[in-house]
Amino acid sequence: MFAPAVMRAFRKNKTLGYGVPMLLLIVGGSFGLREFSQIRYDAVKSKMDPELEKKLKENKISLESEYEKIKDSKFDDWKNIRGPRPWEDPDLLQGRNPESLKTKTT
């Protein structure tokens, strides 16, 4: 007796027919997505070997150490060479003669 009354209510009331299943889908989907996204975070939390972790901590590279490496380098004697466009010949543009680049075999 209870089932026909419920089915009749679903057919007559659009909120019960469309709204409740939609809300169940949204709420259930959010719980499902939470489980799938938790897998991603669990995979990232992998343990590292302690010896390897010590080596990585010793080899820290800082901005100051890199600056000290290139501080004494000279960058004043460089030449700006424009790269060729797709329709240009790169050998002629850069001052190289294509005939002189070919090796002569006799």
Curated annotation (Swiss-Prot):
Transmembrane keyword on record: yes
Mode of membrane association: Single-pass membrane protein
GO cellular component term of the entry, any: mitochondrion
Mitochondrial matrix side: 1-14
Keywords carried by this UniProt record: Disease variant, Membrane, Mitochondrion, Mitochondrion inner membrane, Primary mitochondrial disease, Transmembrane, Transmembrane helix
One GO term of the biological process aspect: mitochondrial cytochrome c oxidase assembly
Keyword Transmembrane recorded: yes
Basic and acidic residues bias (residue ranges): 77-88
Stretches that traverse the bilayer: 15-37
Function summary: Required for the assembly of the mitochondrial respiratory chain complex IV (CIV), also known as cytochrome c oxidase. Promotes the insertion of copper into the active site of cytochrome c oxidase subunit II (MT-CO2/COX2). Interacts specifically with newly synthesized MT-CO2/COX and its copper center-forming metallochaperones SCO1, SCO2 and COA6. Probably facilitates MT-CO2/COX2 association with the MITRAC assembly intermediate containing MT-CO1/COX1, thereby participating in merging the MT-CO1/COX1 and MT-CO2/COX2 assembly lines.
Additional free-text comment from the UniProt record: No COX16 mutations have been detected in patients with cytochrome c oxidase (COX) deficiency.
Name of the protein described by the UniProt record: Cytochrome c oxidase assembly protein COX16 homolog, mitochondrial
